[in-house]
A protein has these predicted regions:
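Hydrophobic residues in beta-strands of the RecA-like P-loop NTPase core, especially within AAA+ ATPase
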Residues: 34, 121, 216-217
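RNA substrate-binding interface of SAM-dependent RNA methyltransferases
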Residues: 46, 83, 106, 110-200
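Active-site/ligand-binding-proximal alpha/beta "capping" segment
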Residues: 193-219
Length: 219
């Protein structure tokens, strides 16, 4: 495992750039932080680089196993100092593991193949809220998520943290325009249910047996 101690190291700078959407798009990668989420990424086989906080390699058997699994998959491993880890992530107290992960995005047709209920998010602006909604959808057994154009970037660090790993195993189609979504829903026999506050049926009295696309609007 190579040691990195300089915040000016090109590898460190490239990873730190992933805090910005422009570079996430250019590199087709994003950051995943924390043992649980990094473990999910390793299990998915999509970790490109793994940064380990210096002095924590053997902090627990679980962490050691994650590092070993990442190495076996061919990920680049780096042991970094705390200043370097702080440079890479956007939190004041960085966790022991941070990974650069290959960006994954589903196509609408992949969601159609799964059937069931699809959650459609429209212009969700807060990264934390977006991540929480994806995590909730995953826990509820939703088959996939559609992010309409105008939603904040799901690969932003705060959004990724809020998903707590769910982003890595629930299909998410991003940047979909409304017209394409409606055309796709009609083509694949989806009933569209839109949430609202007034003059609406109760969620608990509504038949949501698939295929149904539930649209939730902005904050």
């Amino acid at each position: 495992m190579k040691e990195l101690s300089s915040v000016s190291n090109p590898i460190v700078k490239a990873a730190a750039e992933l805090k910005q959407k422009k570079y996430r798009t250019e590199q087709q990668a994003f950051l995943v932080e924390g043992m649980r989420s990094v473990e999910e990424a390793v299990n998915c086989g999509i970790v490109k680089q793994l940064f380990v906080l210096k002095g924590t390699k053997t902090a627990s058997a679980r962490q050691a196993a994650i590092i070993a699994a990442a190495a076996a998959e061919g990920a680049e491993l780096y042991e970094v100092t705390e200043p370097v880890m702080k440079k890479i992530v956007d939190t004041e107290t960085p966790q022991a593991l941070t990974a650069v992960v290959a960006r994954q995005s589903a196509a609408l047709e992949e969601l159609a193949a799964a059937g069931g209920i699809v959650l459609v998010l429209d212009r969700i602006g807060d990264p934390g809220n977006l991540g929480t909604m994806i995590r909730t959808a995953d826990a509820a057994g939703i088959s996939g998520v559609v992010l309409l154009a105008g939603c904040t970037d799901i690969f932003a660090p705060k959004a990724v943290r809020s998903t707590m790993g769910s982003l890595l195993h629930i299909p998410v189609a991003e940047g979909i325009c409304e017209a394409d979504f409606i055309s796709w829903a009609r083509k694949n026999g989806y009933e569209i249910a839109v949430t609202c506050l007034e003059n609406a049926d109760s969620l608990y009295q509504t038949d949501l047996q698939g295929p149904v696309a539930v649209v939730v609007g902005s904050e």
